[in-house]
Amino acid sequence: MAVVASAPGKVLMTGGYLVLEKPNAGLVLSTNARFYAIVKPINEEVKPESWAWKWTDVKLTSPQLSRESMYKLSLNHLTLQSVSASDSRNPFVEHAIQYAIAAAHLATEKDKESLHKLLLQGLDITILGSNDFYSYRNQIESAGLPLTPESLGTLAPFASITFNAAESNGANSKPEVAKTGLGSSAAMTTAVVAALLHYLGVVDLSDPCKEGKFGCSDLDVIHMIAQTSHCLAQGKVGSGFDVSCAVYGSQRYVRFSPEVLSFAQVAVTGLPLNEVIGTILKGKWDNKRTEFSLPPLMNLFLGEPGSGGSSTPSMVGAVKKWQMSDPEKARENWQNLSDANLELETKLNDLSKLAKDHWDVYLRVIKSCSVLTSEKWVLHATEPINEAIIKELLEAREAMLRIRILMRQMGEAASVPIEPESQTQLLDSTMSAEGVLLAGVPGAGGFDAIFAITLGDSGTKLTQAWSSHNVLALLVREDPHGVCLESGDPRTTCITSGVSSIHLE
C-alpha cells in the first residue's frame, strides 16, 4: 500500500542572514504550498530468488519535470547507484533515501526480515510540488491571461515546471528552475524522509508527537534525518530554518550548532551509513523553536515580480565576505537588525494577546483599519483598548520599516541586491495601500516573491493593485501545520477541484 506524506514551504519573515548564527532568531511561517512524496513497492510480491540479492531497485519519478530515474540500492552498504542514461540527478532525494533507509536499519536491528522484504520489493518514489513553489508567469502571459490569482487557479494541479532561460553571457545568476522562493528543496527532502520512514515502520505519522524508537518524538527523528540529508546534498550546513519549518510548521527558530553535523560531513565517504545516522540521532541537537503564528485576522500574501528567483548561496557568501572585511560595521548592522526583528516579533505577539483578551474590540479595529491607509488608523483610537491595538499595529509597521532599511544597508555594503531598487518601489507602494500592515523581501531577499501581511479582507484590493503593477499574486497563504500523512495521492484528490482547469504549454 502506498504511503503519501507532505511537507510545507516557508516564508522567513524576519531573521534573513542573522538566523545563520546563534542565538539570532527567525520568524518563519509555513504555508499551504506543500511537497508530496508517494512511496510504494515496485513489485507486489518478493521474487523467490531475490533473497540472495545484494541490490534492489529504486525508481524516482518527478512528473512535473518529466523525469524518471532508476537506481540500484546496495543492501549491504545502503548506498544508491544511478543506472539511468540521463545525468539529471536529485541529490536532495538521493540523500533522503539513503539516510532514511539507514535509520530504518538502525531501528530494526533485532528484526530485519520485514525491512528486508520491503526493500526487496523495490521502492517506487514519486515527488510532486504544489504549483506555488514554481513560477508560471511565462505560461500565463503566453496564454494572454491577466496576471491574477484567478489565472493561476486555472492551472492544472502539479503543472509542468518552467525552466529559466540561460543567460546570454553564460552567467548562472538564476536557478535552473524558475521558483518563487518557498524552500522547495527543504519541503521535498522532508516529505521524502517522512514518507520513507513511515513506509519502513520507523515512525508513525498518524501520531508523530509521541516518543518513538529512538527515545524522542517521531517528528524529531524526521527533523534530524531531513536536516542531515538536506545539508549533505547542499554541501554545507545551513541554518536549517527551512527544514525545521517543513517538519514542525510555523515557528520562532534558533539554529542548531553546526558541529552536530560535522561528523556526518567527514564520515560520509568512509563509515557505514547506519553508523553515521546513529551518531546523528544521538547528537546534541540544540536548535530552539517556539510556536508562532500571525495574529488573528492577519493574512499572508506573496507577490511574484517575475524575475525568476535569486541564488541564495551566492548572496549569503557575499554577506559573509563583507562581515570578514568590515567586522565592526557588520556587527553594528546585525545588532540593530536583531533589535528590530525582536521588536516586530514582540508587537505581533502583543497583538495576538490583545486579540485573545479583547476580541470584540480587536475585531472592530482590524475591520476599520482594513479599509484605510495606515496614517488614518489613529482616527479609530477613540478608547484605551482601541488605542493600544492601533499603537501596536503602527509600531509593528515601524519595526518592519527599520528592518528593511538595515537589510538594504547590508546589501549595499556587501554588494548584493537584498532589497533591489525595483523591490523597494514595489514594497513602498504595497505598504502605503489600504489595510496593509507590513511588506518585505523574505529570507535572503533578492528577486524572489515579496510578502505582505494584510488586515481583514483587504487582500483582494492588494492583489488587484499588484496585478496593475505587473506583479502576480500567488495563491499561497499561511498554514501553521508541518509534515503530515496524507490520505491518498494528491493528484486524485485534486481532480474535482481541477475539473475546470486548463493546461498551459
Swiss-Prot record:
Binding residues for ATP: 177-187
Entry-annotated residues carrying N-acetylalanine: 2
Pathways per UniProt: Isoprenoid biosynthesis; isopentenyl diphosphate biosynthesis via mevalonate pathway; isopentenyl diphosphate from (R)-mevalonate: step 2/3
Keywords: Acetylation, ATP-binding, Kinase, Lipid biosynthesis, Lipid metabolism, Nucleotide-binding, Peroxisome, Steroid biosynthesis, Steroid metabolism, Sterol biosynthesis, Sterol metabolism, Transferase
Lineage: superkingdom: Eukaryota
Enzyme Commission code: 2.7.4.2
Protein name: Phosphomevalonate kinase, peroxisomal
Organism: Arabidopsis thaliana (Mouse-ear cress)
Lineage, highest ranks first: Eukaryota, Viridiplantae, Streptophyta, Embryophyta, Tracheophyta
